[in-house]
Amino acid sequence: MTIQRILPSARLSEVSIHNNLAYFAGQVPELTIEQNAYEQTKEVLGLIDKLLAKIGSNKSNILTAQIFLADMKDYAQLNQAWDEWVDHVSPPSRATVEAKLADPHWKVEIVIIATC
């Protein structure tokens, strides 16, 4: 059994690949933490795009997305950014839940599984 770890640190790997499935760690905003949920979501989706490219994949290969929102009042902003970004020909399954995130500045965290 071979597992490939992408961008590992002492705590986690950003992506773990096994049997052509890529399991992503939760992606969170880095540069937009003082901005609204729309901007944070756009940044996080951009980070996901970069990681997908790093493993030779793209958003049309996303199987599922789990989205954690700090406050459901931001659901419309999240959906606006998502709808601008998602591959409308091959949209993944998706769940969105409200959750207390690890950093109080984060409004969104996204976890995906994709093929590669």
From Swiss-Prot:
Q: Which InterPro entries match?
A: RidA_CS, RutC-like_sf, YjgF/YER057c/UK114, YoaB-like
**SUPFAM superfamilies, A to Z:** YjgF-like (SSF55298)
One matching Pfam family is: Ribonuc_L-PSP
Q: Tell me which PANTHER family the record gives.
A: PTHR47328, RUTC FAMILY PROTEIN YOAB
User: What family does the Swiss-Prot or TrEMBL record give for this protein?
Assistant: Belongs to the RutC family.
Q: What is this protein called?
A: RutC family protein HI_1627
* Species: Haemophilus influenzae (strain ATCC 51907 / DSM 11121 / KW20 / Rd)
Q: What is the lineage of its organism?
A: Bacteria, Pseudomonadati, Pseudomonadota, Gammaproteobacteria, Pasteurellales
